[in-house]
């Protein structure tokens, strides 16, 4: 049977089970299940026998399959995911968390689910500052976040937190500039790193973008410690484990900030569950923005 061409915005391409499965996995379905439903959508197309179908009609067909197989909640998430393409402002996801909680992995997986190409790690910004600014001029950027206490006065009550806050403020200037440019250029973006202070950019972002914030943590200490054993190359586990108490202290500090700012805290007990939680945050936010725009 000839392939059905999906028509959208004046162009067309044959129906792709892979693309449909990616769309369905974006709403939280396991990939195997997403492919199964994509095949069922293909079966519906074959039954129709149409040579061409509008993208909106294909989406309605997919919603019918979802409603039958997964229920109304899945249909709602699918509609929110589709609304991403119709946003009048860029999506900016801010993912905070201390060392070893899985921020980079989660950000990469989230970008794939959302079809985004720009992921910025705040530690890269710190490394750039470190390369251009001498230790004498700005010592705090020459330390890892959990060692930044060495750059502040010994008289301070909690040097670990004070040093981290100072470093986050310095790096935060670069983070703000990157997010500001993304808003101006309407470029979707994920920013991940410990220097994303929960709630710090809420006033600056305002209505310029569709912002989603989350703090990623690992509540179980043994599981958190085990994460460092998975690291290799230039980031040996021993260095992190020697400073594990400081890393946990910064996690507690960030958690307090997140709760005070109303930023969701996501426990990365397993990466799949954490990804699903963050995806729900994104889709819920997009759904609220789409509803307010429509009304």
Language model features with spans:
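Extreme N-terminal, non-catalytic leader segments
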Residues: 25, 30-92
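Glycine-rich phosphate-binding P-loop
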Residues: 93-114
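Loop/turn-to-beta-strand initiation segments
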Residues: 117, 184-191, 212
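Conserved nucleotide-sensing/catalytic segment adjacent to the nucleotide-binding pocket
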Residues: 131-187
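A glycine- and Lys/Arg-enriched "phosphate-lid" helix/loop adjacent to the NTP-binding pocket
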Residues: 210-253
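NTP-dependent small-molecule kinase module
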Residues: 252-295
